[in-house]
Amino acid sequence: MGGFKLVSNFKPTGDQPQAIEKLVEGVRRGYRYQTLLGVTGSGKTFTMANIIARLNRPTLVIAHNKTLAAQLYSEFKEFFPENAVEYFVSYYDYYQPEAYVPETDTYIEKDASINEEIDKLRHSATAALFERRDVIIVASVSCIYGLGDPIDYENLMLSLRPGMVKDRDEIIRKLVEIQYERNDINFTRGKFRVRGDVIEVFPASFSNKAIRIELFGDEIDRIAEIDVLTGEVLGYRKHVAIFPASHYATSRDKLERAIKSIREELEERYKELKEMGKIVEAERLWQRTNYDLEMLQEMGYCKGIENYSRHISGRPPGSPPYTLLDYFPEDFLIFIDESHVTIPQLRGMYNGDRSRKEALVEYGFRLPSAYDNRPLTFEEFEQRVNQVIFVSATPGPYEMEHSEQVVEQLIRPTGLVDPEVIVRPVKGQVDDLIAEIRKTVAKGYRVLVTTLTKKMAEDLSDYLKEMGIRVRYLHSDIETIERVEIIRDLRLGKFDVLIGINLLREGLDIPEVALVAILDADKEGFLRSETSLIQTIGRAARNAEGRVIMYADTITNSMRRAIDETNRRRKIQMEYNEKHGIVPKTVVKGVRDVIQATQVAEKEEKYEKTANFYDPDVIKSTIEQLEKEMRQAAIELQFEKAAKLRDMILELRKQLEEVSLR
């Protein structure tokens, strides 16, 4: 397979060419860390695509959540239709990790709902890395979580060609060894079926195609790719590589060694717990682990096999797990998108996992080796990366300290400049704001207002309504889908002013917004830090008449730095426009490609359980609401709450079935 082929109607413009050139040159010189400081709307993704095409290396793009990763994945797929653009995020729709709460003696079993489509995409991503070099994998931070041994994964691959001497039973045995399940009736992903001398395999990385292997005696006669639904032959293959159905698949020899090693650890830990006087814990561990060992012996697999991954891969205690990073070749390139958010996330993954496992190990639910099924620490992540380009409009201290060069991309292809920032006193701020809203709305534009507290946002919203202004309040209790609809309505002009507390997380790139008002701008804190202020100011940068008004009595250090940086960028942009005769134009964007809500997990909502529902729609919406709360509780390690919510959901599902049968 050749290199990357970038397909686009656009050519790099503004300062994109110099950014591409400098970063490509930096990689070639061997710079380990570089930063692309690109303002909102300057085409950072297009710049990344051009760098990938020029360097021709396997590339990992890390985003800070699934939604942002999905957005980048679809953009890169458009830029590289002929190359392998893959998607690697957590495959859980819902995940309640295994936990133990000593205070109430409550053990919560792992409960998860796996998204089959995402699991298929994960397998497709790892398989692509062993088959070709023109690979881009867009991943969330879950790429630093443990995965099986890449050497095993490659060695266990079943490679078949027509004319090869392979007996039918040998192929079947090999498929079972790499975790494929024989099922002649229900033919789904990760299964195979046998009909006489024909074996059909549904690879883990395929979604609607399967492989048909036709044998003649002990020889492979033909290999065809077939449509799973119709059985129609889509084409014949000269070679097929079938990768394991699980990333934790391993050879029988390794499994036998792992079983011996687990048993040794069990005996040692059992003795240790007994000596500490923890009789109940010792017996619990003995029973649970022996059950898992029997499953491994007979089936080659057990529930929670990832907790034994250190034994299976033969790693020493305390050693880092294998992750997606280990599947890449040595010369791979990493882009960390929105690095000011992603880097702190990568730093925090290990500690949260460790604190949950401590109770499980201490109380005899797991062996101490379960600690080694974990995400990488940040230091281990740093050791595994080859060359990194951080991408952000507001790079954090880590990126600025480590980068061997910071390349700025300040010119927008549309000629738009950063908005003018005005500071006004707090006294009379509401009356002044109303006057500014009326002026802006009269021109057909919209307004964003950001406050510090929920109470203030609600009061302001009520007051503006009384003054005859069409306003909506965007708060954390609103679900993602409804939020998308609210922003769509704002763009369509169904209302003119949107009030919120944190307008950063929404991905609110709305061209119709010509005014952003920041109330209490001088109250230092997370929402009024330099980074947050610059990001908020950027919300007005999609409109040629964009302005930002900060209401403050004193100018804080954060405000001063944010205003100075905005004015510096604005000056460079205006000089560029004047030199090249460019007139800024407001972005014209169809309302259907509206926004990208970049926050997957919502804040919790209050839920009071009502006795009985009789309306199926009400039950369904309540289940959806509870599932959202349950996921959030699991993320925040509130396992008892998540377990209670799960039980409520199960109860409501039963009720839904009963109502449907009436």
From Swiss-Prot:
Location of the motif Beta-hairpin: 91-114
InterPro entries the UniProt entry points to: Helicase/UvrB_N, Helicase_ATP-bd, Helicase_C-like, P-loop_NTPase, UVR_dom, UVR_dom_sf, UvrB, UvrB_inter
Residue ranges constituting the Helicase ATP-binding domain according to the UniProt record: 25-412
Organism domain of life: Bacteria
Entry keyword set: ATP-binding, Cytoplasm, DNA damage, DNA excision, DNA repair, Excision nuclease, Nucleotide-binding, SOS response
Residue ranges of every copy of the Helicase C-terminal domain listed in the record: 429-595
Entry's Gene Ontology cellular component terms: cytoplasm; excinuclease repair complex
PANTHER family: UVRABC SYSTEM PROTEIN B
Protein name, entry field: UvrABC system protein B
Annotated organism of origin: Caldanaerobacter subterraneus subsp. tengcongensis (strain DSM 15242 / JCM 11007 / NBRC 100824 / MB4)
